[in-house]
């Protein structure tokens, strides 16, 4: 193999890696925020379900999760993945894994905000949504 052939293959792999990384961030960060809200919800079954999801995702190896996402549809539904669907399965696997980690980061950050900031927003007449997006989320 020549040097240029090797470099072309390496560049192709780098493009795939960067695209997987960017798409994983694009999907896992909002999903993690939704999971964090579910984890902090007052509705106990939802809170319990999100806690279970986070525990399973953080407690099992990523490689095992990727294998389940890749081979699971075949064994459960008889759907064989090939071509572009393999890439999609990879994005789904990484996204659901990293969403659990982002959820804990978001939850701990939100819960660390002093109560006085919520009270100050209430005095200023902010709604709960305004309080979150203008005061809590930027921190």
What kind of feature is each model-predicted range?
Residues 1-139:
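Transmembrane alpha-helices and adjacent helix-loop boundaries
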């Amino acid at each position: 193999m020549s040097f240029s052939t090797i470099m072309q293959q390496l560049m192709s792999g780098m493009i795939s890696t960067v695209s997987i990384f960017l798409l994983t961030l694009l999907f896992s960060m909002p999903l993690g925020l939704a999971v964090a809200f579910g984890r902090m919800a007052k509705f106990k079954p939802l809170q319990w379900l999100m806690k279970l999801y986070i525990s399973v995702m953080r407690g099992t190896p990523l490689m095992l999760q990727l294998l389940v996402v890749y081979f699971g549809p075949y064994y459960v539904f008889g759907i064989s993945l090939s071509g572009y669907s393999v890439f999609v399965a990879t994005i789904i696997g990484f996204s659901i894994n990293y969403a659990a980690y982002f959820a804990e980061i978001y939850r701990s950050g939100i819960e660390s905000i002093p109560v006085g900031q919520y009270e100050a927003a209430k005095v200023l007449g902010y709604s709960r949504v305004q309080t979150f997006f203008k005061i809590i989320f930027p921190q």
